[in-house]
Amino acid sequence: MTMNRLLLLILPAIIMLAAMFATSGMEQRLAAFGTSPQAKLMLGRAGLALPYIAAVAIGIIGLFAANGSANIKAAGLSVLAGSGVVITIATLREVIRLNSIASSVPAEQSVLAYADPVTMIGASIAFISGMFALRVAIKGNAAFATTAPKRIGGKRAVHGEADWMKIQEAAKLFPERGGIIIGERYRVDRDSVAAMPFRADDRQSWGAGGKSPLLCFDGSFGSSHGIVFAGSGGFKTTSVTIPTALKWGGGLVVLDPSSEVAPMVCEHRRQAGRKVIVLDPTAGGVGFNALDWIGRHGNTKEEDIVAVATWIMTDNPRTASARDDFFRASAMQLLTALIADVCLSGHTETEDQTLRRVRANLSEPEPKLRARLTKIYEGSESDFVKENVSVFVNMTPETFSGVYANAVKETHWLSYPNYAGLVSGDSFSTDDLADGGTDIFIALDLKVLEAHPGLARVVIGSLLNAIYNRNGNVKGRTLFLLDEVARLGYLRILETARDAGRKYGIMLTMIFQSLGQMREAYGGRDATSKWFESASWISFAAINDPDTADYISKRCGDTTVEVDQTNRSTGMKGSSRSRSKQLSRRPLILPHEVLHMRSDEQIVFTSGNPPLRCGRAIWFRRDDMKACVGENRFHRTGTGTDTHTEHAPPWQKEGTRP
């Protein structure tokens, strides 16, 4: 317990009692100020209630003085205790007085008829003060009236009557039985610590966070997809990825750029009977064949081969120059031809039909590759292969060099043995994910995603298509939880899954840092409208971008507020003042208020419902999650080098596992 909290817990009650005892017996002194018998009687009677009223007044003043403090609940408990003692003393004094006159009271009358009204008034005021102190002790700073303007509803709401979704309605929309965790069922802006910034290492700033029921999405409405926007350091992993990975019961694919989620949740999911696979380039021996799903479940191999080529080359949503577009398109056609040669020509063994083999064929010297293409054209058993190769047979050397350079550049990451092993291995099959009992964590750090986004695109695209090609013949739904998804660049299969994934058992939860990231990856301002139209829920938290804050403010809508206006005029003959009330338009939340929101607070939008303002389910605040989470590699406990200890949460400083 801190010293400030201890003082607020003790001092108000002591000062209240000191004031009560110091003003006891003041009735004689006050009566002396009277100039008539009636005045003396009135002042004397007021002096009897003065000790109780003085104690109560000091307690109330203390509560208002502590308004905004993190320890105001302690002050509320102290004033509550002081009010209780004041009521007890007033009652005891009156009981003693009535007991002394009980023998003189006629038998047909009750001794309570002679109770002192002034003392009863003083005790009643102390009781009211105690109830307010109890409210402060329970709600903290939220017990005091807000300074927001008065909102008008009904017929007078000429400018709109937008309002936040009620918590009871949110509980029905997002029941706890759902597997995707949205947040916590409480209003952060009405919590006792609303005026304080959230700090992970300061438990006093948590407020009701971690103790409130969860809001979870069960995929029962809309497309079942969700989008999360949270700024850098905005607790994206701790409030979305880890809690959902702990609670989701179906197939799970997680893009984990920090490589911290898998070690923290793998054991919990294995205990639940799940098969957990971690695709980590630093740990060899784990990989799958990214081409093993091609042509299965009634789909044509040619279409699937083209899809793989687009993931490696990446589509560009923005308009490029004609020259660049020609070389990129030709390089994609060359890559398509080489993949088709491996898969369709019939001269490559099934177990050797991998992207590693495609890269080996492509990385040959340019003259040798041209000779190979001519040989493929003359001897391939597939018409599709011949049609794609024919363009390059008689292409001029200069043009072919540009095409060749583009293709080699885009497949450069396949020359790394550890990266190629991830998409050319045999430790598991894409069918394992579609069968519903497998979870896959893609542990590619930001450096790898930045330098080789094609690797992540191929992995995620293969897993998505393996489910999509089954036409809904899968066990349960598979959740793709993609953190830092903007690093992947433009991925068309994600748009396909966005528009039709619900029917095929695919659910997407994508995490961006801002609207700008989405627009950069998916082609300008039109990207937001396409994605928002297809999302069941959209969450905004820890926003630092003014454009994003302005969008949130506009989407929340406008309210009608009543404004008091005072006009003063001064002239030669004097001055006058007039007061009036008028109705004005005000956004439900202003852009600067969005920027000032606590980082553990979020705004969630759903189609056809008011905006929801609620808390975030940060895992280290919840005892039920801490009990089943493994060690965080960025906050190691025990001995060793830990550069985060100084700012680590309390349980990490104590050396205990969360």
UniProtKB/Swiss-Prot annotation:
It is a multi-pass membrane protein. InterPro entries: P-loop_NTPase, T4SS-coupling_protein, Ti-typ_conjug_TS_TraG-like, TraG/VirD4. Gene3D superfamilies: P-loop containing nucleotide triphosphate hydrolases. It is found in: Cell membrane. It holds the Pfam family T4SS-DNA_transf. Keywords: Cell membrane, Conjugation, Membrane, Plasmid, Transmembrane, Transmembrane helix. Coiled coil: none annotated. Residues 562-573 have a biased composition (Polar residues). The keyword Transmembrane helix applies. One of its GO terms (cellular component) is plasma membrane. The chain crosses the membrane at residues 6-26, 46-66, 72-92, 118-138, 215-235, 275-295. Residues 562-585, 637-658 are annotated as: Disordered. Belongs to the VirD4/TraG family. PANTHER family: CONJUGATIVE TRANSFER: DNA TRANSPORT (PTHR37937:SF1). This is Conjugal transfer protein TraG. The lineage of its organism: Bacteria, Pseudomonadati, Pseudomonadota, Alphaproteobacteria, Hyphomicrobiales. The gene is traG.
